[in-house]
Design a protein with these regions (language model features):
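Ser/Thr/Pro/Gly-rich low-complexity, intrinsically disordered segments
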Residues: 5-10, 21
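Gly/Pro/Ser/Thr-rich low-complexity, intrinsically disordered segments predominantly at protein N-termini
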Residues: 19, 23-238
Length: 238
């Protein structure tokens, strides 16, 4: 599996700046936001453009899109397929049913997660923890600091990033024990689990009859629940 190369996925995602601009303009956002979106579009045309952390925090705080910051660049993580949404919803509903009453919580994709090696934070499709949720105020918003499980539903444009660079950053979260990478165009899940000695092991499940054991939560996750209602007739494009 090829490792994530920062320039390529970022440029791919920045093409959604046009959509972001239209959203702001249609809703008559403030002049500042329009200017911020224009800067985002200009960045796509000019990769040398860099944002300060303060500029990013203001843009993300007021945006309806999920924006991430890395090395002075801003890129959009929103914009998914129907299959992606269905899989995310299936996992959320099933995990919530399994851990309800145990003091655990499942967070959806709008939850900011503090990532020590890639400040200020990242967005995941799903994050889960058992016990008290802990937050840190970053740029006026709360970022979760203690997830135990993170789930990413893979898209063609983000798979290399989610498997490579993003996972390398997630590993800097002290409480993280488990990471799931879920394909959307075929039944396939990669599970990475952190052992007591700090090393990560990985397993693959690629049949609808398979079941994953989630040690971080003490429950099982059948693939048939993940892919309920999802068609594999054609590959997803997002």
């Amino acid at each position: 599996m090829a490792l994530y190369t920062p320039a390529n996925p970022l440029r791919t995602r920045r093409t959604r700046a046009d959509t972001l601009a239209e959203t702001f303009e249609n809703r008559e956002q403030s002049a500042y936001l329009k200017s911020a979106v224009e800067r985002n579009i200009n960045m796509a045309a000019n990769p040398e453009r860099r944002y300060t952390l303060e500029e990013y925090l203001e843009l993300d705080r007021t945006s309806e899109e999920r924006l991430e910051f890395w090395n002075g660049e801003v890129f959009c993580t929103s914009g998914v397929s129907d299959e992606h949404d269905a899989i995310e919803g299936n996992i959320y509903a099933f995990l919530r049913s399994q851990i309800m009453g145990r003091g655990c919580r499942v967070f959806l994709a709008n939850m900011r997660i503090k990532v020590p090696s890639a400040p200020p934070y990242r967005y995941a499709d799903l994050s889960v923890l058992c016990g008290k949720a802990e937050f840190e105020k970053i740029g006026g918003v709360n970022a979760l600091t203690n997830p135990q499980l993170i789930v990413e539903v893979l898209s063609p444009s983000t798979e290399a990033y989610d498997r490579g660079e993003k996972f390398s950053h997630y590993k800097s979260i002290p409480t993280l024990r488990e990471y799931l990478l879920v394909a959307q165009h075929r039944p396939h899940v990669t599970r990475l689990y952190k052992q007591d000695d700090g090393t990560w092991i990985h397993t693959e499940a690629n049949e609808l009859t398979a079941t994953l054991t989630l040690d971080s939560l003490g429950c099982d996750l059948p693939l048939v629940e993940i892919y309920q209602g999802v068609s594999f007739d054609a590959p997803a494009t997002n």
